[in-house]
Amino acid sequence: MKIRWFTNLIFLSFFYGGISQVNEIIEFDSANPFSMSDVINRIEHQEKIKVFGKLTLPSENTVEKLPLIIGVAGSLGWRKHHYEYLKMFQNEGYATFELNSFKSRNITSTVGSQVEVTTSAMILDAYRALEKLSNHPRIDKDKVSIIGWSLGGAVSLFSGWLPLKNAITKNVSFASHLAFYPPCFIDPENTKFTQSPIHILIGELDDWTPADPCHMFVNKLSKTANINLTVYENSHHGFDSEEPIIFNKRGYSFKDCLFRLDEDGDVLMNFLSLPMSSPLMQKFGFLFCVERGVNIGGNATARKKSL
């Protein structure tokens, strides 16, 4: 599955070879929910925060509004290969938005903890950004897609879950969702997802966010959602980078986990089915199935195919 298929599926094709670009820093209001249940049931009571991102546009004074791709980084923050994808989209005439959920909260990484900035907070950020950018004079609000990697892949994937999405906004939607190696081991009881296309890309050997649950996830949702999966052979987490494969001893391996996501937005522990609705409860829940130590790095063949 190539990224160009993803973009051409929804958007008109533009090309601005070699032109200059302009950048805008866009700021908007968001909040700091920990769990999806915080968003669904208590969104008005969450700590408020200002979040920003960088919008990149062709400098040409075109009369047509532009399609936009919102990018969401993973637990290590924005990496070289993430920017390469944004640059590729820009070269093909798309506007891009680099969402800075981490920098807005003075965080550089959540590896080995996953509590400082959560999937739920970043999904809220993404929709608040979409609301803001939908009013931008050069953006076509009906042609805004989201792409994310790892933690950002979770944002891209679960921003399509309607109980969560509708609690945030019913006024705007993403035209498509592309998720690189997301946590498919979160199993939703409620299978109501957006009808916009969702595509998951993951490595066969991923021991951070394993591929097997993605097969189950897609099979479960395929009757009601427009969702597909591509698995790359002999590939680890971060297969789309050019970095060598290394062992990250702090990273959480979820290969033995399958967490249930209930109707209210609580992610439940294995066995005990208690909600992991706070940092302490999440840490306790991880004791039942999570191990330390994961492999991460690129695969040249998979990278080429994914582009």
What are these regions (language model features)?
Residues 226-307:
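C-terminal catalytic histidine-bearing segment of alpha/beta-hydrolase fold enzymes
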Residues 21-64:
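N-terminal cap/lid segment of alpha/beta-hydrolase-fold proteins
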Residues 59-66, 71-108, 185-187, 205-211:
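Short substrate-entry loop that stabilizes the transition state in hydrolases
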Residues 194, 200-202, 206:
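Short beta-strand/loop motif that positions the catalytic acidic residue
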Residues 196, 209-220, 244:
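Short alpha-helix in the alpha/beta-hydrolase fold that links the catalytic acid
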Residues 114-137, 158, 306:
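Alpha/beta-hydrolase active-site loop
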Residues 138-150:
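Alpha/beta-hydrolase fold nucleophile elbow
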Residues 39, 75-83, 87-91, 101-121, ...:
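Cap/lid segment of the alpha/beta-hydrolase catalytic domain
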